[in-house]
Amino acid sequence: MPRSSRGGARGLVVVGDTTDDLGRLGRALAEHLDWPLLAEPTSGARGGPQALVRYAELLGAPAGAELSGRAQRVLVLGRPSLTRSVTALLARSDLPIDVVTATARWTDVAGTAAAVHAVGPGDRDAPGLAAALGLEPAPPSWTAAWHRAVDGLPDPPEGGEALTPDGVALAVYASCDPARAERAPDLVLGSSMTIRRLDRLAPPACGPAPAPIANRGLAGIDGTLATALGAALAQEDGAGVRAVVGDLTFLHDAMSLGRGRHEAEPDLQVVVVDDAGGAIFSTLEYPAVMAPRVFDRYFTAPQGADVAGLARALGARVSRPRTMSELRHVLAGPVRGLSVVHVCAGGCG
């Protein structure tokens, strides 16, 4: 059992990409301590009354800066890597940061962790672990203040029937929520903008949190479809796998959908959010320092490939919904065989 390292009561629980059991522990700790929960989509922790939506956006706003300035401790599980505002929070040297990990080693990117606590299978009891670490519950007003601050953020735009990247990602996420479907498909997320859209907007689950799969780390978008294919071939419950990726992620790994004539067809549906290139770069500094034409050519890099034609050439059935209602109808069906849903979400023609 880890040793205690005393700290204040106004804490935050941050859960990044991790194993399902460690994610559940993070959620249980947040609920036991009444601390706000900042959980990435692949954490397995994104659920319950402590979980915040749009937390990274809040941290970058004045209200979030004021609240995080009042925090007395941060508890980290897994490897948060999706947003700059969370990275900045974990780089603070004035805030005690404790890490709970199931592995013998944990990379402290900012060099600010006060302690790293390795927990074994017998240390997954949240009240016992909290006591061992000297973690004190916060007053209910602490988490309530964070929820009020999130509610005070400007409302995200409503897409209506238009196919927007945010709306498509949320629809796919909802279709794979085990609380909404008796046999929900497993979910694989593209590692560029798709996972970040869901990190910002996916609502916390009321019951067990969805646990999507995503490639993290140096691989970037490479191999995402191979990962989805492997998950589909390994699946045993027959619900299939649904992947949601951008057009560049699809094109980088499209040949993974090919198979030999004697190989089994996977139950895999790939939803391609085609927004004409790499949208993630528009969220960084590059557009402000170069001409739009240069930025579009070298960073957004829209492609001339025929996504639907390529998918058909690889043996996939293709559908192309034109509205959100049509997309939801496609997503309401079971995942059987190999299919690609090509969603034109801006600029793809």
Regions found by a protein language model. Give the residues of each.
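Redox- and metal-dependent alpha/beta enzyme cores, enriched for Fe-S-associated oxidoreductases
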Residues: 15-50, 171, 181-185, 195-201, ...
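Terminal amphipathic helices with adjacent charged low-complexity linkers/tails
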Residues: 97-140
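Short beta-strand segments
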Residues: 14-16, 76-78, 100-101, 190, ...
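Active-site diphosphate/adenylate-binding microenvironment
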Residues: 143-238, 339
